[in-house]
Each structure stands twice: as structure tokens, then as C-alpha cells.
Design a protein with these regions (language model features):
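Long, low-complexity segments enriched in small/aliphatic residues
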Residues: 1-45
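Long, contiguous, secondary-structure-rich segments that constitute the structural scaffold
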Residues: 39-41, 45-143
Length: 143
């Protein structure tokens, strides 16, 4: 038999996570944003004007943690920490936080030399050898 199984395996990757990460309360999503192609053009002034350093938080989680839109927040896990500005929205489910991928560390106004990638693993996906950002868990707190 050659190739990949045509049936998608939707098993989450918690079994491969370090023990200290499995119990962290938030799943981090870090998709691309339409305002730029990965990080290739982030040096262009009008593209940089778009705030790529937001952390979207569900209203239920934000209320429980005392976080409001515009507050500086800290995401952290055993790999590191990163700072963002909160955006409270129903676009993310409870227990999920969302930041944009490919932020430049040197341009983060909320915490110099921090970005989403400092929280993710170096593990690659089985299909395509891409970064496996979809299985990252973090803490969220007001900074």
C-alpha cells in the first residue's frame, strides 16, 4: 500500500505533548492573516500598520480572567512567553486563544523579542513537513 490513508485522522496530539503542557488551559491557534503573505512583506509600512500582535480571547474566558479588549496579555508555556494586546471576541471558542502566525519578534510593541513562534514546538507535520502549530497549549494572563 502506497501513500496516505484517505480517511483523515482527527486525533489531537495531546499524547505527544510534554506532561507540563497537557494541563495548560488554552489551545493556541495561529493562522495566517490576509494582510500579508506569511512574514515576507512585513517590512512594508502599510502592511505593518495592521496590528498583527492581537490575541483573540472568548468573552467567557476574558470575563473570568478580568481581561478587556486593549489590555496587554501574556501567553506562556514551558517553551517561553509572548505578549500581545487582547481582543475579546466570539470568533474563538472558550478555551481557545488566537494570534497571527509569523509575527516579527523585533517589531512587537507589547514585548520586544516575543512572538507566537516562541510558544510552539519544532515538530513537523506528517504530510508536507510543515510546522505543527495546531497542538500548542498555553496559559493566558493579564500582563
Amino acid at each position: 500500500k502506497a501513500g496516505f490513508d484517505p480517511v483523515i485522522d482527527l486525533t489531537l496530539c495531546e499524547e505527544e505533548m510534554p506532561e507540563e503542557e497537557k494541563n495548560l488551559p488554552f489551545r493556541l491557534l495561529s493562522p495566517g492573516i490576509p494582510q500579508r503573505v506569511n512574514s515576507s512583506f512585513y517590512n512594508v509600512k502599510y502592511i505593518r500598520a495592521y496590528n498583527a500582535y492581537e490575541c483573540e480571547v472568548n468573552p467567557e474566558d476574558a470575563k473570568r480572567l478580568g481581561i478587556k479588549s486593549g489590555d496587554k496579555v501574556r501567553l506562556n508555556n514551558q517553551r517561553g512567553e509572548a505578549f500581545f494586546v487582547a481582543r475579546v471576541t466570539t470568533r474563538v471558542a472558550p478555551g481557545v486563544v488566537r494570534t497571527a502566525k509569523c509575527n516579527w519578534r523585533s517589531t512587537n510593541p507589547y514585548g520586544q523579542n516575543t512572538n507566537t513562534n516562541s510558544l510552539t514546538t519544532g515538530k513537523l507535520t506528517d504530510m508536507g513537513g510543515c510546522s505543527a502549530y495546531h497542538s500548542t497549549r498555553v496559559n493566558l494572563s493579564k500582563a
